[in-house]
Amino acid sequence: MATKTLKVTQTKSSIGRLPKHRATLTGLGLRRINHTVELEDTPAVRGMINKVYYMVKVED
């Protein structure tokens, strides 16, 4: 059974953002603008995405 994944892309810079938000981007594996990672769709990942929703784009 395949697990559902999400494609998360960083759309804005982390410069000048709250330290916790910068750490959340790092936790998601995002390093720079337009960097895309595929992550499993879990409640923990969804919570991290919700925290930095204004800096990322999510595709199913």
Swiss-Prot record:
Coiled-coil ranges from the UniProt annotation: none
Keyword Ribosomal protein: yes
UniProt keyword annotations, A-Z: Ribonucleoprotein, Ribosomal protein
UniProt xrefs under PROSITE patterns: RIBOSOMAL_L30
Pfam families: Ribosomal_L30
Transmembrane segments: none
Gene Ontology annotations for the cellular component aspect, listed alphabetically: cytosolic large ribosomal subunit
GO molecular function annotation: structural constituent of ribosome
InterPro entries in the record: Ribo_uL30_ferredoxin-like_sf, Ribosomal_uL30_bac-type, Ribosomal_uL30_CS, Ribosomal_uL30_ferredoxin-like
BP GO terms, sorted: translation
Subunit details: Part of the 50S ribosomal subunit.
NCBIfam families reported in the protein's UniProt record: rpmD_bact
Protein family according to the UniProt entry: Belongs to the universal ribosomal protein uL30 family.
Name of this protein: Large ribosomal subunit protein uL30
